[in-house]
Structures are given as C-alpha cells and as structure tokens.
C-alpha cells in the first residue's frame, strides 16, 4: 500500500446510481489515476452495520450520509496531488460528471500515524 491516501465519500443524484457508477468506474477513476502521485484506486459500496436491538449501548450511531467511498493511494504528499487534481478539474481534463451530487462530496487526505500493525 502507498504511503498516503485520499478518501472520497460521495453520492449520486437521486435515482442516478447506475449512471453514476458507470461514469465513476469507466471515466472518473481512470482520469484520477492519470494524475501524477495517484498510484491505485479502490471503490466501495456502503455496507450498513446492523446493531442488535437488544444491546444496551451508551449511544446509537447516526445513519451514514454517503453510499460510496473510493480510496486513492498516493506516492507523494496529499497537497501536491490535490493541486494537480484541481488544476485538471479547472482545465476540464478531470471531469466531475453529470450524476455526481457535488454537494455531498467529502474529500480528505491522510498520512500515516505510526507504523502499520497487523493481527498476530
């Protein structure tokens, strides 16, 4: 796995899931993978966690607000990749599509904290 990550949470416009996923997989991910510093991508569908109703929990988890996640692996600092990403969006060479609900997008950059640990 690469050193740094972008995590992007998103939703399609209402009723546009199929078109959104087709665009994301066939157009958007390849465009993002063309950005220097982006070395890999993996998309995820929301898998809602069902909490047993008989548990006495101190608080309930709020419902999720996003249905899709993509994790981009980066081989350089997130700021450098973001600068090129935005440059390409403004130039029109990295598209945001017609089915993406831009108002729901959450993009964050992440750098490791400590060493990676694995279960024994």
Please give the residue ranges for each predicted region.
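Macromolecular interaction modules
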Residues: 1-120
């Amino acid at each position: 796995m690469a050193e740094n990550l972008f995590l992007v949470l998103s939703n399609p416009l209402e009723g546009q899931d199929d078109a959104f996923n087709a665009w994301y997989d066939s157009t958007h991910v390849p465009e993002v993978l063309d950005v220097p510093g982006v070395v890999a991508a993996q998309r995820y569908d929301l898998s809602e966690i069902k909490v047993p109703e008989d548990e006495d929990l101190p608080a309930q988890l709020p419902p999720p607000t996003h249905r899709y996640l993509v994790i981009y692996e980066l081989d350089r600092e997130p700021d450098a990749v973001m600068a090129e990403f935005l440059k390409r969006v403004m130039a029109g060479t990295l598209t945001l599509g017609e089915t993406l609900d831009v108002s729901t997008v959450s993009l964050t950059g992440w750098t490791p904290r400590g060493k990676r640990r694995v279960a024994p």
